[in-house]
């Protein structure tokens, strides 16, 4: 781990993050928010970690344990008291936090859409027959093959800059990147956003999750709470409940998004077969004033609808959940 940004004044908080440019940008956003919300009473020492997932640059996460590979080192340091806070991209966080840890804030969600990048095409439909798509995401692979089964898929791993470089080197004709990450890095213009209705994102995509221990003092918890954005917090609860019910990991193509429909929330979720040959979708709605418990029930109900429909085809859903 590496100290990136020493505290400038106020009570010191050790804020853990991955060391990629995107992760550091997110950590600085949270650190700045804490300084502002506490009027300088708290300051942050940003501590960067190289996680197991960062070290796996050539293979899919599914082959190395799935979710948690980008959070495990941070989780352990937080549990040992070496960190006060950990900042994560929510889509990388397992559906159940380690014992003794809680979410303290969900800042305003950035663009949740996936972005399409290619030097010769404006959309996946424009790619030539048999074109090569670079991705390490089972979800994106399945969704792309559902639209274009003729595409060839090669594994693309690495941070945003690495994947853009691989595309530039001609290792693939196209790739996908989260618009949230591109926007936070000031690179949104390099990609074409894909409508949510056409390509549902990963649960929690575009949301930052701030995690702390459950014994944190109430003063700090109140300050962190000021960083939260209520619609983003609501979406995080519903989408993660959907994911937890499905026992979601990197082993199954799963997508979910909570849509604002004016006077109600609508959760749409989907599971795809590997390769995208079959897609199962479910949806449900709840009132805007729904409690956290009702949001959890919404997520679980939509997941159960899919489990019932898909259990004959996908053995992972064959047991009762």
Curated annotation (Swiss-Prot):
Record text on cofactor binding: Binds 1 dipyrromethane group covalently.
Record-linked PROSITE patterns: PORPHOBILINOGEN_DEAM
Taxonomic source organism: Hyphomonas neptunium (strain ATCC 15444)
Transferase found in the keyword field: yes
Protein name stated in the entry: Porphobilinogen deaminase
GO BP terms in the entry: protoporphyrinogen IX biosynthetic process
GO-annotated cellular components: cytoplasm
Gene Ontology MF terms in the entry: hydroxymethylbilane synthase activity
Note, other: The porphobilinogen subunits are added to the dipyrromethane group.
Residues with PTM S-(dipyrrolylmethanemethyl)cysteine: 250
